[in-house]
Amino acid sequence: IFSAMVVYGFLSYEDGKVRIPNKELMNKFDDMIQKEESLGYVYRLAKESERMLQATLAEDTQVMEEILEYAHNTETPILSYNNETELSAIINLVYLSVRDKYRVEREDKAGKGFVDYIFYPENKKDPGIILELKVDHSPREALKQIVDKDYKLKFQGKIGEIKTDHKILGVGISYDKKTKKHSCVTQWL
């Protein structure tokens, strides 16, 4: 179907990506997404997810915390609300749009341990992002783990691989079971 849409000009294909080629078609697509209730959720999710990425890159931890709390409170069943697996599921949800610009790896071997999330930028100009999650610990402890375990080594490649010189943003995210609050801290590594 996508191939036919490219052939007929409804979509364009460049650098391994399919996109809507002109503003008129994009506006029609936006209208359809906003009018079609079943797609409206996807549209809102994509917008919030993009807002989360932009807040992360801007180190706007207040906006990050608001988005995390809203997603956690509206998307997670109350019985598993305090589960670290659910926090990870919320991270997948709020960072959904990051996959357009980054290759996302979970529980990846990095430095002296396993990093919760690592975002490898597709564009060499974009920074790399390392996320570490903690439940009932501070976000500073998560960030300290990123630094202490040298997770940024993952961006330097293995022996014999080409090293990258990306800027790397470390992000510590925590959830407190008692207060039901999320906290975030960021630091350029």
Describe each region flagged by the PLM.
Residues 1-144, 148-150, 180-189:
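Extended alpha-helical interface modules used as scaffolds for assembling large macromolecular complexes
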Residues 151-159:
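Short catalytic/binding micro-motifs of nucleotide second-messenger systems
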Residues 158, 162-189:
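Domain-level recognition of nuclease-like catalytic cores that cleave nucleotide substrates
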